[in-house]
Amino acid sequence: MSGAATTEGAVTRFDAALVGTEARDWFALLKPRVISLVVFTGAAGLAMAPGPINPLIAAVSILCICMASGAAGAINMWYDRDIDAVMTRTARRPIPDGRIRDDQALGFGIGLSVASVLLMWLAANALAAFILAFSIFFYAVIYTMWLKRSTPQNIVIGGAAGAFPPMIGWAATTGSLGVLPVVMFAIVFLWTPPHFWSLSLYACKDYGRAGIPMLPVVRGARHTRWQILFYTLILSAVSLVPSFLHQAGWLYTGVASLLDAGFVACAVGVLTDRQDEAGVSLTGDRPARRAFRYSLAYLFLLFCGLLADHFLIMR
């Protein structure tokens, strides 16, 4: 009797572990790291919007942004399953590893996309729902199915997909758009190239093996280093636009200036990294890795500075 109970308990624990593993696989399909940044920038746009904020509408809107980001990520993983399988960085993703079927992933992504847009429409307004739908389409179709495999400017143009959340958040609570959410869009848009090109420098062989025309693969490492610095300088200028438009005060100006100085220093470090004649790093791309990590902190801290300035200084 006790033996049967022990066996039954073991089976129950095994089933629970299996369910937990499957849940983690589906969660991984949503690209949770991307979601975290997308949701944060969307919430920042919502919080910066003028007028009273309905807590329920705000919560549902952020949930919709989260769902939409995950849906686009799932469709991206479905379409990229062939190249994910040959890249070291992505080979263990759920679809190429055989843990989730590709048709399941596509159905999940489409269903989640429709649900997120309809819920945003019902809870917030048509403008927010339209921008949300367009952002899903832009990432899943324009970027994933067209730009990513056809041009080294894939990240530059495709970066618009990840830049929409501040506009969505703002529109969800106001039903309109203003200058500030457009500037926030521009900041994220210009942040995307140096962020991803830093990654592509030290993952260049992976991208080349998969046939993805990332800038270092097509134009070489040296050209990419100059482009990282170029876009970082433009980003630094645009990040100060809220101050010049009197949409932010001295606190944000100080935070942005310090963060910009750090980002430019990282970009200069990438440019002056010890290289061979082809521009390939002789240091294991340590400066590029440092720039990639810094870029993540940069965007988070920049928007934190904008929020802190809004609630502590500008009000």
UniProtKB/Swiss-Prot annotation:
Keywords annotated in UniProt: Cell inner membrane, Cell membrane, Heme biosynthesis, Membrane, Transferase, Transmembrane, Transmembrane helix
Query: Known EC number(s)?
Result: 2.5.1.141
What chemistry does it catalyse, as a reaction equation? heme b + (2E,6E)-farnesyl diphosphate + H2O = Fe(II)-heme o + diphosphate
- Enzyme class comes to transferase
UniProt xrefs under Pfam families: UbiA
Q: Which family does it belong to?
A: Belongs to the UbiA prenyltransferase family. Protoheme IX farnesyltransferase subfamily.
PANTHER family per record: 4-HYDROXYBENZOATE SOLANESYLTRANSFERASE, PROTOHEME IX FARNESYLTRANSFERASE, MITOCHONDRIAL
Check the record and name the HAMAP family matching this protein. CyoE_CtaB
Name of the protein described by the UniProt record:
Protoheme IX farnesyltransferase
* Organism expressing this protein natively: Gluconacetobacter diazotrophicus (strain ATCC 49037 / DSM 5601 / CCUG 37298 / CIP 103539 / LMG 7603 / PAl5)
